[in-house]
Regions:
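Extended, Lys/Arg-rich, non-catalytic nucleic-acid recognition/anchoring regions
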Residues: 1-296
Length: 296
């Protein structure tokens, strides 16, 4: 028998009580600090009179607080109606499903609610897509805010509509899985409210191939031209993006649908497109296939 002194059993109840007291004291101190900050803001010496950093307790709460202003308001200019409340529903979905499935389901729900409230399909998809991406990134990254630029409904050469999503440089922070699932969510949402699929033209396909040849930033995987052509042709959503690099395209400089909101051509390399296709759709294709097969 060992002569070492006997180790006393831990008093679990006491430890639980001490932990609860510690968390309660943290909450009390936070309330005090926020009260002081609110009084300071009321002086009108800062840019805004409200505290910019809201409190959030979990993923559902963080997602709502992150996107509430302006993306959950039916009319962000008028603010005559309260924003959509998604916290409780998202929390319920996260209890029943994995995070990726919950992201898709809450994105569909937000899109339908926003479309019913506004009748604006573009805004409905925009709000739903950002909510889905926020859930995928734990609502702690800038990707849902700055990683997506314009979400637009544009026209194919035959006049039919399609969805175009502008991906920007900060989408890199989301990682390949969230980038690829962002495209999948966009496809699901455009189907939900009756927007057609993207039918790329030869110049639009060749433009992406040219950009990969010019892109000099780090990529985990740079697809060859043949693979790029397959992805662009088969993707039902247009992976678009803002110009991020200094290099200008030469062969396919001015291409229909690769334009800014005001109609001017985007002639330089679009880094967000490279990231989403290279690190997202190419590297995470098996994961996307798993979700598409499960969702039929």
């Amino acid at each position: 028998m060992s002569n070492s002194p006997r180790i006393a059993e831990m008093d679990v109840n006491r430890l639980e009580s001490e932990r609860s007291s510690y968390y309660e004291s943290l909450d009390e101190r936070i309330e005090e600090v926020y009260a002081i900050a609110a009084k300071a803001k009321e002086q009108g010496l800062d840019f805004s009179k409200s505290i910019e950093i809201p409190r959030a307790s979990d993923l559902a709460s963080r997602t709502e607080k992150l996107l509430e202003d302006p993306y959950l308001f039916a009319d962000p200019m008028m603010r005559n109606r309260p924003p959509l409340k998604i916290e409780d529903k998202l929390r319920e979905l996260l209890q029943k499903h994995d995070r990726e499935t919950a992201a898709i389901m809450i994105a569909i729900s937000v899109t339908k609610e926003m479309h019913a409230a506004t009748g604006d399909r573009r805004r409905a998809i925009d709000s739903g897509l950002r909510v889905g991406l926020a859930v995928l990134t734990e609502a702690v990254l800038v990707a849902p805010l700055d990683g997506i630029g314009d979400v637009r409904i544009m026209n194919n050469t035959d006049g039919s509509e399609f969805l175009s999503i502008d991906f920007c440089g900060p989408i890199r922070a989301a990682g390949g899985t969230a980038q690829a699932l962002g495209v999948l969510i966009g496809d699901i949402l455009r189907r939900e409210i009756g927007v057609g699929r993207y039918l790329p033209t030869i110049p639009e396909v060749e433009r992406v191939k040219e950009e990969f040849g010019l892109y000099r930033a780090n990529l985990q995987y740079k697809p060859p031209p043949e693979e790029t052509e397959i992805i662009v042709n088969e993707c039902p959503v247009m992976i678009n993006g803002e110009e991020t690099e200094r290099m200008e395209c030469a062969g396919y400089k001015e291409v229909k649908n690769i334009v800014n909101e005001n109609g001017t051509f985007r002639t330089r390399v679009r880094g967000g497109v490279m990231l989403v296709i290279g690190e997202g759709l190419c590297l995470k294709a098996p994961k996307i296939q798993t979700h598409t097969e499960r969702l039929n």
